[in-house]
Amino acid sequence: MNRPDAVPGTAPRPPLPEITFPEALPVSARRDEIAAAVRAHQVVIVCGETGSGKTTQLPKLMLTLGRGKLNARPGQRARLIGHTQPRRIAASSVAKRIADELKTPLGAVVGYKVRFQDRLTREASVKLMTDGILLAETQTDPLLEAYDTLIIDEAHERSLNIDFLLGYLKQIL
C-alpha cells in the first residue's frame, strides 16, 4: 500500500485508537479548557480532587492534541508523552488502566517503565514511569528530548525526587 505520508524505509505508523472520555469525570467536563491551556502555555498545572480523572484522562487528552509518537508527522522526530508517578505500583497500574480505556494491549500505545520492568514497545506513545526513572534519564538525555510532553503527577507529595525533577525542569525550560 502506497501512503502519501509514509517515509521510505519505515514501517507504517499504527492508527490512533478511539479515544473517549467518561462524562462522569470532572476532567472530562473541563477538557476543552485544559486543552486550550496546554496549547497556549509551556507549563500547565492541573488541580483537582482525588478521582477527578487527572491521572487517567490527561494522557489521553495529550494524544488528542497531537502529542506523542502516534501523532508524529513524516520526517518529524517521534517523541513520547512522559507521565511520572511516585511509586512503581502506581506507574504500572495507571498504564494498565489507560491501555484498557483505549482498548489496546499494554505496551502498544501506553506502557510503563519502572525499576527492573519495562513494558513499552518502540511504537508506544505514552510512557508511565516513576519520577526516579525520569531523573535517571536526565543523565543520558539532559534536555529530555525523548519527550514532547511531561506530566508530573502527584507533585504535591514533595518527595526528594519530585523536588529535584521540578527544579531540573525549570532549568531546562
Show the residue positions of the predicted features.
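Helicase-associated low-complexity/disordered flanking segments
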Residues: 1-43, 59-74
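Conserved P-loop/Walker A NTP-binding site and adjacent catalytic elements of P-loop NTPases
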Residues: 37, 42-173
